[in-house]
From Swiss-Prot:
Name listed for the protein in its UniProt record: V-type proton ATPase subunit a3
Encoding gene (name): VHA-a3
Residue ranges, Cytoplasmic side: 2-421, 491-548, 603-640, 780-821
Protein family per UniProt: Belongs to the V-ATPase 116 kDa subunit family.
Keywords: Acetylation, Coiled coil, Hydrogen ion transport, Ion transport, Membrane, Phosphoprotein, Transmembrane, Transmembrane helix, Transport, Vacuole
InterPro entries: V-ATPase_116kDa_su, V-type_ATPase_116kDa_su_euka
Transmembrane segments: 422-442, 470-490, 549-569, 582-602, 641-661, 759-779
Entry comment describing in which tissues the protein is expressed: Expressed in etiolated seedlings hypocotyls.
Organism: Arabidopsis thaliana
Function: Essential component of the vacuolar proton pump (V-ATPase), a multimeric enzyme that catalyzes the translocation of protons across the membranes. Required for assembly and activity of the V-ATPase. Involved in vacuolar nutrient storage (e.g. accumulation and storage of nitrate) and in tolerance to some toxic ions (e.g. zinc ions sequestration in vacuoles).
Length: 821
């Protein structure tokens, strides 16, 4: 299958439409040059290695220790990246080449730097924790001190008031009161207290739990701290309250301590003595200033160390990633029996054979190997991977095609046509040259700044737009083209190419139908005559035009898809598919909808008033009836009968012969009677055989083949109708876009203009801009994009595209520097 070239004779080879010719190669590499060989092949990026040790676990492979070593170095580099990111230290651009440094030196250097950085971080964390604890302690001293000082003042005031009252009372009562006072003083209970901070969101629950646990035998006061404080345990900012709890007895104290621990409340010692409090505040403030100086010095040393790491970070990162990738690939190679050579197998394009051999030779010379590597091509029945060479212009279109399914090996590539048809169908739905210019300007910014933007991390949506910038460029150019055809600039018509061909008979003709218009000049040379816009017949005329145009475009693209199936069949030498798939499909589709397209063109050319709906419906319901006024050309009835007969005959031609022919070819192949039919087998059977590897006699289930063909036939017959109707979305979305644009212009911009008020005009212009950008340039663009995508995936590609291949994924270093592990 793969070895066959393009179709000969009248058929072009279509090299641009086929994936690159691939070959399965075997490399026998000496152990001493294996590492350098894989490195050079990674730089080349044209070999997809096969895993020859798939039965072994990762730990049983030859280079498991080296991969573990590289993984440890990669962990250290990730640690450095996180630390640099937190400190705001950027990594400098790579200077020098990674080949100039030795991996052992890198490993030693990384280990030393990590140990030093970990030690600095540990010391800094301890100092920062102490600093945060002292900050909390200082707040407790301040807030609790305020509470105690206010309590002392209020107690002193109350005592003075009580003494003054007692002095004025009767002298007979004085001994009695003094006796009572002396009795009370002997019964006084010593109260203890605890101070600390509790998170504010837990403060109410904390107070309630304390009250219940001690049965109300506590007194608690809380004070709010205005600014958030850094918690010493978590290192995060938190809003907290200072609390003071008074209790009686050791049992109550133990309960309070447990509750404080459960709520994460930090406790700090506190003295009742006011003089001692002031002394403690002074001591804490002094220690805080000392710690602050020490922490700043530690952070400065840490930043110097991180800047040293940043100078070589990119170089080390690339070196470690490359080494890890090389050892992963070496683990896919198998040892030969002598354990002196490694054997590799993989896919590569045929054109790369010379480059691969040059890389092998350079690796042998550079590693001073006594023996060179052996390169040989293997014969196989496996299906090769699919490889299309793309550039930055075509890669996005190829990604759109591959999102549906990767092409089978050397299957015709829809991307060749999609480069043009996708933006064109988008533009049919988005035809407005004003909107097209807006999208063009935005896309030109992405293209002009592509070098700068390519090196930056963009958001998900922006990343997607940047990746498809050339697709959007084509979409905008085609939108300008179709907008000129529709003669719409933000829904406003302009006589760009010539004056209108029509004039009004009287002043009121703009409100009438086209009967009020007189043709006074030549037909408008390009696109739609601007006189249609604003007339009563604008909508019926545009509906008729765009609906018929959608059918013509749809039938043309579906015919292109069927023609591509012919070239696929020629390429894979499957005459069964030519005679019993391509020809019946072409006959069926064009007998019905090809005929409808011809009628549309004839009606346009002749100006006939024939009802094409009536013609097509009664072509099936009453084929023998006369057409009458709906006849467009002589012998139309006879032609319709012939076309209807051909359409009916083509259905059994698609369904019945192919399964029986495949069965006969299978029997002949395995009875040894004939070998010629091998080339004419259906390509789907080739894939099954190839996938089976060494199976000599594949199973042939006639019932499965017949049911598959039955489904395929029914799908095509019904799809011919539904797919044609599906292309009417071109008409519907184009009409919706035009009407929305017209509504925004007339009901927002013109309405605001009519008020003669500058404020209303500014508001109206802003609403018009936001509505145009948000709805028409964003939502409508996305909607038209998705509908164009569906038309290509379903209506076009299902006519010929199997898409059951797998992508060529070579071993390469190109993306190693940009991808995160």
């Amino acid at each position: 299958m793969a070895e066959s070239g393009g179709g000969g004779g009248c058929c072009p080879p279509m090299d641009l439409m086929r994936s690159e010719t691939m070959q399965l190669v075997q490399l026998i590499v000496p152990m001493e040059s294996a590492h350098l060989t894989v490195s050079y092949l990674g730089d080349l990026g044209l070999v997809q290695f096969k895993d020859l040790n798939s039965e072994k676990s990762p730990f049983q492979r030859t280079y498991a220790a080296q991969i573990k070593r590289c993984g440890e170095m990669a962990r250290k580099i990730r640690f450095f990246r996180d630390q640099m990111s937190k400190a705001g230290v950027p990594a400098k651009e790579m200077q020098g080449k990674e080949n100039d440094i030795d991996l052992d030196d890198v490993e030693v250097k990384l280990g030393e730097l990590e140990a030093e950085l970990v030690e600095i971080n540990a010391n800094n964390d301890k100092l920062q924790r102490s600093y945060n604890e002292l900050m909390e302690y200082k707040l407790v001293l301040q807030k609790a001190g305020e509470f105690f000082s206010s309590a002392h003042r209020s107690a002193a005031d109350q005592q003075r008031e009580t003494e003054s009252q007692q002095a004025g009372e009767d002298l007979l009562e004085s001994p009695l009161l003094q006796e009572e006072k002396s009795i009370d003083s002997t019964k006084q209970v010593k109260l203890g207290f605890l101070t600390g901070l509790v998170p504010r969101e837990k403060s109410m629950v904390f107070e309630r739990i304390l009250f219940r646990a001690t049965r109300g035998n506590i007194f608690i006061r809380q004070t709010v701290i205005e600014e958030p404080v850094i918690d010493p345990n978590s290192g995060e900012k938190a809003e907290k309250n200072v609390f003071v709890v008074f209790y009686s007895g050791e049992r109550a104290k133990s309960k309070i301590l447990k509750i404080c621990e459960a709520f994460g409340a930090n406790r700090y010692p506190f003295s009742e003595d006011l003089g001692r409090q002031a002394q403690m505040i002074t001591e804490v403030s002094g220690r805080l200033s000392e710690l602050k100086t020490t922490i700043d010095a530690g952070l400065g040393q840490r930043n110097i160390l991180l800047q040293t790491i940043g100078d070589k970070f990119e170089l080390w990162n690339l070196k470690v990633r490359k080494e890890k990738a090389i050892y992963h690939t070496l683990n896919m190679l198998s040892l030969d029996v002598t354990k002196k050579c490694l054997v590799a197998e993989g896919w590569s394009p045929v054109f790369a054979s010379r480059e691969i051999q040059d890389a092998l030779q350079r690796a042998a010379v550079d590693s001073n190997s006594q023996v060179g590597s052996i390169f040989q091509v293997l014969r196989t029945k496996e299906s090769p991977p699919t490889y299309f060479r793309t550039n930055k212009f075509t890669s996005a279109i190829q990604e759109i095609v591959d999102a549906y399914g990767v092409a089978k090996y050397q299957e015709a590539n829809p991307g060749v046509f999609t480069i043009v048809t996708f933006p064109f169908l988008f533009a049919v739905m988005f035809g407005d040259w004003g909107h097209g210019i807006c999208i063009l300007l935005a896309t030109m910014y992405l293209i002009l700044k592509e070098k700068k933007l390519a090196s930056q991390k963009l958001g998900d949506i922006m990343e997607m737009a940047f990746g498809g910038r050339y697709v959007i460029l084509m979409m905008s150019l085609f939108s300008i083209y179709t907008g000129l055809i529709y003669n719409e600039f933000f829904s406003i018509p302009f006589p760009l190419f010539a004056p209108s061909a029509y004039d009004c008979r009287d002043v009121s003709c703009s409100e009438a139908t086209t009967i009020g218009l007189i043709k006074v000049r030549d037909t408008y040379p390009f696109g739609l005559d601007p006189v249609w816009h604003g007339s009563r017949s604008e909508l019926p005329f545009l509906n008729s035009l765009k609906m018929k145009m959608s059918i013509l475009l749809g039938v043309s693209q579906m015919n292109l898809g069927i023609i591509m199936s012919y070239f696929n069949a020629r390429f894979f030498k499957s005459s069964v598919n030519i005679w019993f798939q391509f020809i019946p499909q072409m006959i069926f589709l064009n007998s019905l909808f090809g005929y409808l397209s011809v009628l549309i063109i004839i009606k346009w050319c002749t100006g006939s008033q024939a009802d094409l709906y009536h013609v097509m419906i009664y072509m099936f319901l009453s084929p023998m009836d006369e057409l009458g006024e709906n006849q467009l050309f002589p012998h139309q009835k006879t032609l319709q009968l012939v076309l209807l007969f051909l359409a009916l005959v083509s259905v059994p031609c698609m369904l019945l012969p192919k399964p029986f022919i495949l069965k006969k070819q299978h029997e002949a192949r395995h009875q040894g009677q004939a070998y010629a039919p091998l080339d004419e087998t259906d390509e789907s059977l080739h894939v099954e055989t190839n996938g089976g590897g060494s199976h000599g006699h594949e199973e042939f289930e006639f019932s499965e083949i017949f049911v598959h063909q039955l489904i395929h036939t029914i799908e095509f017959v019904l799809g011919a109708v539904s797919n044609t109707a599906s292309y009417l979305r071109l008409w519907a979305l184009s009409l919706a876009h035009s009407e929305l644009s017209s509504v925004f212009y007339e009901k927002v911009l013109l309405l605001a203009w009519g008020y003669n008020n500058p404020l209303i005009l500014i508001v109206g212009v802003l609403v018009f801009i936001f509505a145009t950008v948000g709805v028409l340039l964003v939502m409508e663009t996305l909607s038209a994009f998705l509908h164009a995508l569906r038309l290509h995936w379903v209506e076009f590609q299902n006519k010929f595209y199997e898409g059951d291949g797998y992508k060529f994924a070579p071993f390469t270093f190109i993306f190693t520097a940009n991808e995160d592990e």
